[in-house]
């Protein structure tokens, strides 16, 4: 059963867990705990989750007959910070290399991190590529262009919140 994928979805009103078999796409286990808590009150969150997760993890591990070691964590939090950024790079009729795009995105990531030191970037979404003023539907690697605009969205959460969740799950020997 090493082909299992485990998802935890946290919202202020519930915790949902789903375990799926990657090879067959079958649901192995689905459960929902109705809980009402403030995801921004870290002390209360820690107390509630430590208690609730212990029972849930035991139930899950009994169902899948193996320890739960790694999960995919989805979080719905009102304090999620979404940062939309666009950057224009002049290529002067040069070919776009994969390393060019990686460098541009890494540079944006560093700027977002530097200007938001209390936040952790959880997702980076490339929203759009604009090549010589025209939108393109694929990564423009290998294209020759005058300029390239990349529109990127960074989804961030508080470092304190992420550290709190990591510690809670670490207490149960689970990583995300």
Specify the residue positions occupied by each region the protein language model found.
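Nucleotide/phosphate-binding catalytic cleft detector across ATP-hydrolyzing
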Residues: 1-14, 18, 22-70, 75-176
């Amino acid at each position: 059963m090493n082909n299992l994928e485990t998802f935890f979805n946290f919202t202020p009103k519930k915790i949902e867990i789903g375990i799926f078999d990657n090879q067959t796409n079958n649901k192995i286990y689905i459960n929902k705990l109705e809980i009402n808590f403030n995801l921004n009150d870290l002390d209360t969150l820690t107390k509630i989750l430590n208690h609730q997760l212990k029972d849930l993890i035991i139930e899950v591990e009994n169902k899948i007959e193996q320890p739960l070691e790694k999960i995919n964590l989805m979080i719905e939090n009102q304090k999620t910070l979404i940062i939309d950024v666009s950057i224009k790079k002049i290529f002067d009729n040069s070919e776009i290399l994969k390393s060019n795009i990686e460098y541009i995105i890494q540079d944006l990531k560093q700027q977002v991190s530097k200007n938001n030191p209390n936040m952790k970037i959880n997702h980076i979404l490339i929203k759009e590529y604009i090549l010589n003023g025209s939108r393109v539907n694929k990564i423009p690697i290998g294209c020759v262009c005058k300029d390239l605009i990349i529109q990127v969205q960074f989804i961030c959460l508080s470092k304190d919140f992420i550290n709190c969740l990591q510690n809670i799950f670490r207490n149960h020997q689970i990583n995300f």
